[in-house]
């Protein structure tokens, strides 16, 4: 960089842009770590000017969605900016200028928590601890960026933006070598039924990481395989309660962070020093003589458990039935009362109509008599012979009206009680009789179920045990036995949930050790 003429006046800050364009397409392989080291300094001790630097990677994919990624809760957040129409993403976000180049980026805890779901260009960029020192007349700000690159498409543009006077930049980029393969311990057993940990995890998670490489941690704690075996807690026997079923366990007594018995989890993402690992518990063996040789223990069952359950069920159903019956009885009584009112109104209307009809008949008879008297006075015969028509008379039947008056009230003709096989009238109200009927019926039903409960439970237990015994065999892995081994062979049985976990490698899975 050419040396500029200096004056006695206070030098003004000069913006220097350093843009390094690296073609990483040919170098990038799935999951490789590259160390990007950048050092910068000043030729003159600056005490009055603000200096700042920010590192950015210009890519063709917006990563705003990854800011809310649940797999990277503590990873550095991104800020998006557009320069000349192109997106530029900064790690970490700008937080204002500080003196002497002390950026807030040095305080970030950027341990990766990846892989990202759906990442196509890179995985988990994070910063190393920055080193700053005063070297005489130089001010040094050193930053190291680790890039976990995979499936790179296009060109990464690494840009270091510097505010200062005559900056000096040193840039280096090199690949971190892969760590050595772990050594497997010598296991004292003839054979152990086990399964590849990545196969178990991928089948349980239903391929939750379609675009990220799955790897395992090369340094302890590590687990290329897990041990699955059958451990029966208690034996089955006759009784009124369900016995304990056979449970399949994974021994993790050698795992540093977990002790005792532990079921395989679906989310075993562990953060390590230089990468990420999908871990399952390591293999450890258990002496079967201490597990299966002991006599099976049975939990003492309460003899009144079934009776208590039946009575509780009966009381609950009785309360529900009484409440429903009382509500139904009240609604039926209200309906009958309304119908009685309507019936009384109809009877009154019919009687009034009958009375009006009788009055009309009296008027007609009176008019007939008047016409007959008038015709006879004039020297004619009566009305009917004169007009040569038969005489008509109104005859009203009163039998239906009499029967309508003999009707009893509707409440006396309609019963509000349910029709039970046994029905009596002890002078009690309808609600009390209905409650007694409900209680007796449910009590008899509970007694009937108590007599059938042992048979039903026995049939269900035998069916479940039969299904458990039909589990398929599990893949076996052989280990060289030792003469002084105290371990015995484990049973190669496994539940049906592990039947599909054959160690077949998916196309998109890379089982190389994570850097």
Swiss-Prot record:
Q: Which Pfam families match?
A: TLV_coat
Motif span (CXXC)?
212-215
Can you supply one Gene Ontology CC term for this chain's record?
A: membrane
Which InterPro entries is this protein grouped with? TLV/ENV_coat_polyprotein
Where is motif CX6CC found? 384-392
Q: Which residues are glycosylated?
A: 129, 203, 230, 251, 256, 271, 287, 351, 398
- Note the site residues: Cleavage: 301-302
Query: Any stretches that span the bilayer, and where are they?
Result: 437-457
Instruction: Quote the residue positions with lipidation, kind S-palmitoyl cysteine.
Output: 455
Query: Topology: which residues are Extracellular?
Result: 34-436
Please list the disulfide bridges: 212-215, 212-392, 384-391
Please list the residue ranges that the record places on the Cytoplasmic side of the membrane: 458-515
Hey, what's the signal peptide range on this chain?
A: 1-33
Give the residue ranges for region: Fusion peptide: 304-324
Q: Give the free-text PTM comment from the record.
A: Specific enzymatic cleavages in vivo yield mature proteins. Envelope glycoproteins are synthesized as an inactive precursor that is N-glycosylated and processed likely by host cell furin or by a furin-like protease in the Golgi to yield the mature SU and TM proteins. The cleavage site between SU and TM requires the minimal sequence [KR]-X-[KR]-R. The CXXC motif is highly conserved across a broad range of retroviral envelope proteins. It is thought to participate in the formation of a labile disulfide bond possibly with the CX6CC motif present in the transmembrane protein. Isomerization of the intersubunit disulfide bond to an SU intrachain disulfide bond is thought to occur upon receptor recognition in order to allow membrane fusion.
User: What SUPFAM superfamilies does this protein's entry cite?
Assistant: Virus ectodomain
Q: Which UniProt keywords apply?
A: Cleavage on pair of basic residues, Coiled coil, Disulfide bond, Fusion of virus membrane with host cell membrane, Fusion of virus membrane with host membrane, Glycoprotein, Host cell membrane, Host membrane, Host-virus interaction, Lipoprotein, Membrane, Palmitate, Signal, Transmembrane, Transmembrane helix, Viral attachment to host cell, Viral envelope protein, Viral penetration into host cytoplasm, Virion, Virus entry into host cell
In this chain, the stretch annotated as Immunosuppression covers 365-381
Coiled-coil residue spans: 330-376, 388-420
Q: What does this protein do?
A: The surface protein (SU) attaches the virus to the host cell by binding to its receptor. This interaction triggers the refolding of the transmembrane protein (TM) and is thought to activate its fusogenic potential by unmasking its fusion peptide. Fusion occurs at the host cell plasma membrane.
Query: Partners and quaternary state?
Result: The mature envelope protein (Env) consists of a trimer of SU-TM heterodimers attached by a labile interchain disulfide bond.
Q: Which PANTHER family does the UniProt entry name for this protein?
A: ENDOGENOUS RETROVIRUS GROUP FC1 ENV POLYPROTEIN-RELATED, VIRAL ENVELOPE PROTEIN
Can you quote the domain comment?
The 17 amino acids long immunosuppressive region is present in many retroviral envelope proteins. Synthetic peptides derived from this relatively conserved sequence inhibit immune function in vitro and in vivo.
Q: What is this protein called?
A: Envelope glycoprotein
Which organism is the protein's source? Answer: Bovine leukemia virus (BLV)
